[in-house]
């Protein structure tokens, strides 16, 4: 008998549904590097339509999607991108924009709601007269939802204002929209409207949407033409990629409608309901006798997987394969785990499911 494991480490842990597996097996495929895979072409066209952009491109990962997007906009070494100091691109993507693209990150503090102050963005834009001394600002990056602030949503109004700032200074705007559909559902705003101001958007298919692999980037035809070359340069060109796109199509079609339920379950897990906007719950641990590492170890012994978010906090992420009974079981296990640790009866050992490592942007 297989023991049920409640896996709340991330929404990246979902397993392909039977429908996805069947679609992958039946997918009509050809060589996508040659531009001939019909399933990939149909999926990319559908994603461009949904996102309100001219074209789309499937890429193996969100990290590659963001990297390709930044390099497409900043195609001259010595370019500079303005982005949040607590953003996924800046913290969790191996510094790829600088190590591979020669693009300098100019950070602006992220507020607790994931935004950056508009006036600080403007102040970070390099003046052309300083070209002898400074990099050239070419791009602004936003993240929606914002992972490190607990899945906070950036509003249409805010995004539009940043877009206006960019246009007035001749800059492009890229949105790291790994969980953009979560933001769309939480805000009640169509996703195409949410990203209207952006010149490019990356969308993760394997987080909240539940596909097994991949991300998609969207933008103008000219942007996607450049992105295709960069994807190949970075080793992201794949052959019969329609197998993956078939699963991704079902993820977009079938899972977006379930995201509101994920958000509801996250609120059940939360102590402070106002702090939860989407599917991510962060909770701080005040008692010094309980560390995130210890708590996650004891939870794993009860078949609940969570992940430390920092030295004092734990993160739980709901997804469509978490049931209401899973949520209630988790709450019970957290209560019992705390009691066990405080009583001195807990046993600690290094476990194997990644629960004792930082979330690292998952």
Regions found by a protein language model. Give the residues of each.
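Conserved PLP-enzyme active-site core in the AAT-like
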Residues: 2-322, 326, 330-362
């Amino acid at each position: 008998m297989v023991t049920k494991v409640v896996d709340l480490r991330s929404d990246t842990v979902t397993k392909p549904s039977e429908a996805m597996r069947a679609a992958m097996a039946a997918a009509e495929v050809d060589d996508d590097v040659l531009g001939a895979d019909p399933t990939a072409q149909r999926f990319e066209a559908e994603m461009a339509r949904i996102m309100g952009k001219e074209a789309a491109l499937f890429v193996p990962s969100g990290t590659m999607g963001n990297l390709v997007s930044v390099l497409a906009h900043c195609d001259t070494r010595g370019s500079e991108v303005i982005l949040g100091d607590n953003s996924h691109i800046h913290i969790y993507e191996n510094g790829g924009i600088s190590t591979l693209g020669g693009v300098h990150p100019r950070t602006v503090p992220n507020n607790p709601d994931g935004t950056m102050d508009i006036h600080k963005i403007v102040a970070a834009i390099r003046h052309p007269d300083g070209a002898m001394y400074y990099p050239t600002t070419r791009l602004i990056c936003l993240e929606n939802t914002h992972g490190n602030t607990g899945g906070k949503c950036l509003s249409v109004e805010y995004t539009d204002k940043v877009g206006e700032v960019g246009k007035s200074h001749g800059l492009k705007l890229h949105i790291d929209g790994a969980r953009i559909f979560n933001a769309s559902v939480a805000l009640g705003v169509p996703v195409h409207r949410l990203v209207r101001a952006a010149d490019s958007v990356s969308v993760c298919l394997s987080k909240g949407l539940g596909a097994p692999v991949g991300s998609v980037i969207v933008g103008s035809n000219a942007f996607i033409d450049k992105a295709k070359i960069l994807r190949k340069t970075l080793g992201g060109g794949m052959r019969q990629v329609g197998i993956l796109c078939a699963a991704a199509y079902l993820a977009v079609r079938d899972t977006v409608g379930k995201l509101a339920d994920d958000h509801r379950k996250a609120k059940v897990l939360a102590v402070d309901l106002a702090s939860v906007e989407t599917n991510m719950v962060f909770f701080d641990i005040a008692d010094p006798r309980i560390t995130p590492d210890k708590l996650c170890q004891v939870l794993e012994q009860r078949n609940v997987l969570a992940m430390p978010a920092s030295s004092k906090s734990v993160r739980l992420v709901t997804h469509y394969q978490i049931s209401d009974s899973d949520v209630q079981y988790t709450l019970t296990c957290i209560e019992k785990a705390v009691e066990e640790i405080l009583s001195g009866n807990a046993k600690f050992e290094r476990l194997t499911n990644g629960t004792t490592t930082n979330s690292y942007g998952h």
